[in-house]
Amino acid sequence: MKIIIAGAYAIGTHLARLLSRSKEEITLIDESEERLASIGSDCDLLTMIGKPTSLQTLRDAGVEDTDLFIAVTPVESTNITSSILAKNLGAKRTVARVDNPEYMEPQAQEFFKELGISKLIYPEMLAAVDINNGLKMSWVRQRWDVHDGALVMLGIKLREGCEILNEPLKNISGPNDPYHVVAIKRGSETIIPGGNDELKLYDLAYFMTTRNYIPYIRKIVGKEHYVDVKNVMVMGGGRTAVRAVKKMPEYMECKIIDKDENRCEYLNDILDDNHILIIHGDGRDIPLLTEEGIRSTQAFVALTGNAETNILACLTAKRMGVRKTVAAVENVDYVSMAESLDIGTIINKKMIAASYIYQMMLDADVMNVRFLMSANADVAEFIAKEDSKVTQKPVKNLGMPIGVTIGGLVRNGEGMLVSGNTQIEPGDSVMVFCHNINMKKIEKYFI
């Protein structure tokens, strides 16, 4: 597949590295020679100095026979313009990063589609959804709803109160049980488990279940004593914080701390809500945190632009009694460190954006792709097509590669867990988990 990426910034360079490992034909365009040089020689891709809004630059990059054009510069107008130009010059599909929430409305997206932009992506809004999913269920590290909750994936850290430790999964999670364990992160190892595998203390386990059985999962993992989050402290008042706070339910009281006085005044203007308080100060200032009630706060969210600051702030909050912490960690190298320090939910906009864009590379009908950063695994929602390989035999006879498991499916709006005897039908929405497997090898089962 031929792909052009416009913008050698955080998301663009991350995508370029990720996709070049998949042996895709990548061209990265940027105006800065320095930014292009920073991607390193270890990536198999072409770089081109130029403006993505230049017709000549796009033609020189070979846009006329490009399968996917991705515009992820920090400038919204550049992304929109270059995507429209690319489509009209021959690119099959285009993606543009935007900063305006108005553009994400369904009518606006249809309007942009008519102009030639296949998909709009707003990483801060996607991150805000993940942040709120983590806050609404303080006992869960990661949550993903499929088909409005027909199926739910929960990533949970297992501690001493868990009832299902040290037992083979075949004894605790049979075909008739209301959950499947679809992945386990143990230290630095990721396991796609079989029936003889066991859950161990401090594992990060990924459960697939239906919404009705979430309370049951909470009970068996020993998390019933975790209080629901009703007050939140946010450090950093950037765009991600604004989007996250606007999505918070009304029952959550929120304090935003930012050290930029002008930014605080701006936040006061745009977040005119009784349950939101803006505080001018440094979120690392322990006396300030104490004065603002950190010891009675149920969740702390660190969203500054500095990963080290966010990690340290969350550690401080945990030592001061805050149970639920969320940290923005944009430096991928720091993610495993944050995990080892027991930072709760980790947000990485690059990873979120990459997952969203990756689904456009697949030929199968894919509704969602999510990279489970903590487990170094992928989960995708495939639609089974008529006469596809996955509909020909029961799951146990499909010959899926090692490192792949099917966690559940949605049929006619109803979530179902999958066993070896399950027969997938055309039109089913199927959840597939992969570890160290290129998703391209899985899609052939669904087309």
Predicted regions and their residues:
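Cytosolic regulatory regions of ion transport systems
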Residues: 1-447
